[in-house]
């Protein structure tokens, strides 16, 4: 028998299925209009069942941040997987190669040594691993820094046993709503990708995939002439600080909290940093007249312009979705105020 959301335990992670599905449809429509593909980033939720719902149409495979996520998605039957991270640890390389024996696996590479290690692991496993050369597009984290460096690396990958050169990737994850000149910075990053792509093609090296962008740069990614696919993940659920970016996506996930103490001008909730991610700021309390003042490990303090009764349920909207999911064992799927089922967050903690 279906139950109402009011029967869920406090601190539960909740996903509005209608909004989640609407977000997927909105992305699909835009991708089709601009001729782009999507590779949803599963670091957002680490939940294979949700990843499967995102696939189909313009979404042909998923993006993973860790080998653990890669393994969890492959075990659930998802067989087109990009690991958008450089891996050099021997044990992790062996695990990647094992997955590649039964699934299509692409891995970001930005160094000769990294390519050599990946090739050796592929040969030992008898598998083929596709490579995306990672280009630094302004994040100053991973990625080759010049077109000549990319050309040299591409030539090595083409000659390396067990490796297949599939294309390029470049991710600029810091361009949130508050970043000045965000569009110009994104365009500059795409220009770096275009320069590398042009240099490779001049040398007769085919570039198939050019992967990049994310939710905060979704609109810019659609308009980019160089990108073939977008790595967005948060688009399906959204975060508080993405509201000002003119995106067609709706807020779809919350955490349930309960008022456990009241003051003359506020209230205390029983959910804190151990229940909701706060890297991008305080969560929002979806309660009229209330705002979040402070959040501790197990409590959230509210300022309230009207009296709030003990036991009042308050939905908190997170500023950071991926870390919120990684704090929970399961997510409850709802339609309206009716709970349909719970889904295990299978790759929770899979940062290995």
Where are the model-predicted features located?
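Generic N-terminal amphipathic, Lys/Arg-enriched alpha-helix
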Residues: 1-15
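Conserved, mostly hydrophobic/aromatic
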Residues: 20, 43, 73, 133, ...
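Active-site loop/helix belt of alpha/beta enzymes
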Residues: 130, 136-247
């Amino acid at each position: 028998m279906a139950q109402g959301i009011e029967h869920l335990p406090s601190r539960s992670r909740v996903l509005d299925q209608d909004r989640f599905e609407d977000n997927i449809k909105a992305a699909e429509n835009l991708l089709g209009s601009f001729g782009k593909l999507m590779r949803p980033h599963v670091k957002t939720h680490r939940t294979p069942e949700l990843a499967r719902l995102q696939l189909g149409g313009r979404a042909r495979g998923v993006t993973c941040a860790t080998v653990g996520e890669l393994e969890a998605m492959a075990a659930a039957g998802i067989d087109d997987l990009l690991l958008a991270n450089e891996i050099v640890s021997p044990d992790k390389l062996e695990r990647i190669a094992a997955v590649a024996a039964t699934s299509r696996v692409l891995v970001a590479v930005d160094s000769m040594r990294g390519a050599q290690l990946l090739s050796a692991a592929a040969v030992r496993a008898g598998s083929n691993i596709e490579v995306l050369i990672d280009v630094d597009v302004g994040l100053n984290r991973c990625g080759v820094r010049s077109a000549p460096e990319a050309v040299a690396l591409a030539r090595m990958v083409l000659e390396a046993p067990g490796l297949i050169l599939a294309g390029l990737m470049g991710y600029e994850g810091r361009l949130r709503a508050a970043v000045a000149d965000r569009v110009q910075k994104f365009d500059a990053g795409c220009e770096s990708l275009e320069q590398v792509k042009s240099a490779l093609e001049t040398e007769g090296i085919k570039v198939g995939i050019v992967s990049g962008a994310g939710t905060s740069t979704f609109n810019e990614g659609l308009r980019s002439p160089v990108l073939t696919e977008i790595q967005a993940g948060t688009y399906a659920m959204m975060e508080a600080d993405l509201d000002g970016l003119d995106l067609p996506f709706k807020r779809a996930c919350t955490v349930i909290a309960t008022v456990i103490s009241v003051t003359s001008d506020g209230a205390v909730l029983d959910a804190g940093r151990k229940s909701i991610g706060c890297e991008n700021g305080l969560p929002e309390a979806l309660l009229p007249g209330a705002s979040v003042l402070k959040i501790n490990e197990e409590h959230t303090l509210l300022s309230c312009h009207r009296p709030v009764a003990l036991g009042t349920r308050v939905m908190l909207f997170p500023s950071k979705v991926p870390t919120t999911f990684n704090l929970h064992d399961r997510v409850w799927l709802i339609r309206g105020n009716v709970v349909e089922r719970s889904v295990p967050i299978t790759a929770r903690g899979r940062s290995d």
